[in-house]
Amino acid sequence: MSALDDSIRVEVKTEYIEQQSSPEDQKYLFSYTITIINLGEQAAKLETRHWIITDANGKISEVQGAGVVGETPTIPPNTAYQYTSGTVLDTPLGIMYGTYGMVSESGEHFKATIKPFRLALPGLLH
């Protein structure tokens, strides 16, 4: 664990995309908008992503790769970077979490934690 691990805060907003979903075919599309906030004193570049996605049946998908939405953004101190992406689940409920692989301006590699967040049809849970 690096001292820089807490310098990045990740906020998430999710949305069910009804128009592109097909519940009769067990296809539930969700979008998620991620805001990555650099609370640190130096710029940080997002190099990799690692997601764990679990649906209500316990099916686990793992996604790893370079950057996000085709970018590897450098986030200056006290600024934020935002993007929107999506995922398809076989169930109307699921959970996602993971990490971003970051590198600081000084070259130190660290992980930014993406805390678990819920993907759910509106009204499914109270």
From Swiss-Prot:
Protein's name in the database: Protein ApaG
UniProt domain ApaG: residue ranges: 2-126
Q: Which InterPro entries match?
A: ApaG_domain, ApaG_sf, Uncharacterised_ApaG
Q: Which Pfam families match?
A: DUF525
Gene name as annotated: apaG
Matches recorded under HAMAP family: ApaG
Question: Which terms does the UniProt entry file under GO BP?
Answer: error-free translesion synthesis
Lineage here is:
Bacteria, Pseudomonadati, Pseudomonadota, Gammaproteobacteria, Alteromonadales
